[in-house]
Amino acid sequence: MENVIFVDKALYFIQKARVQCQNRKTHLEKNNKQDPLVEDVLEKLMDLEKYLNKKVEEIVKQHPAYDWFSNIRGIGNLNIGKVFCLIDIEKATTISKLWRYALGAPINGKVEKREKGKPIHYNAMLKTMCWRLAKSLIRANGKYATYYREQKKRITEKMEQAGYTIISGSEKGKEKVISKGHIDRMAMRKMLKLFLSHLWLKWREALGLPITKPYVHEIGGHTSYITPEEMMEAKRTKKNQ
């Protein structure tokens, strides 16, 4: 897992340097100039970037749950690597423990947030990586994105039935008012909890660790089980890796 962190950090700096070189090359070209050194450095940076991307792919393919998450639309080698490298699956003995560590847990009815002088019970970096992954899942428009849209619709209807006014702006300081952004984040969190429960299940299952039942959710008053396999789609191609 440490290798993923090392390669990811190296890749970040190489990509940053490559972009700077490309910008320099573009600037020179606009002024009808060339700099052999810039072009040579750019070529070497691009080669190193390709090498590091290949290394990330090799590391991710060794993950116990790879056969499952490699078939999830929206999951790429980098975004999933940044998530699982921060998780100690042996310590996460239950799904709820993983949820709390990755996303924070409700305290007095509100999601835990960082407050000055107070300890937090989640990994801030992991939480950030999870939210980035959530956006990737939604953009990919796969089965997790479908679940997200279903949850967004359900939450919206529930709020309307409870007498809430849904607005586009800030809801701060207003009673019986909730913003569209708040509902969106609630739906994304639901989707992330489902994904993390599936990752937890397939990962621990592959390692022979004790597991519990899959994540349960309520739809129309009926209890349904969504299995990790139900969310799998066609094998990814190199294009969407």
Predicted features by range, described:
Residues 1-30:
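Phosphate- and other anionic-substrate recognition elements at nucleic-acid/protein interfaces
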Residues 3-6, 10, 37, 180, ...:
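Non-transmembrane, amphipathic alpha-helical segments
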Residues 9, 16, 75-78, 93, ...:
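Generic recognition of stable, solvent-exposed alpha-helical segments in well-folded globular domains
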Residues 22-78:
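Helix-hairpin-helix/helix-loop-helix acidic hairpins
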Residues 68, 83-185, 189:
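Phosphate-backbone recognition surface of nucleic-acid-processing proteins
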Residues 80, 127, 131, 135, ...:
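Amphipathic alpha-helical core segments of compact helical bundles
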Residues 169, 179-216, 220-231:
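Basic, amphipathic alpha-helical segments enriched in Lys/Arg and hydrophobic/aromatic residues
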Residues 232-241:
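Acidic, low-complexity intrinsically disordered tails
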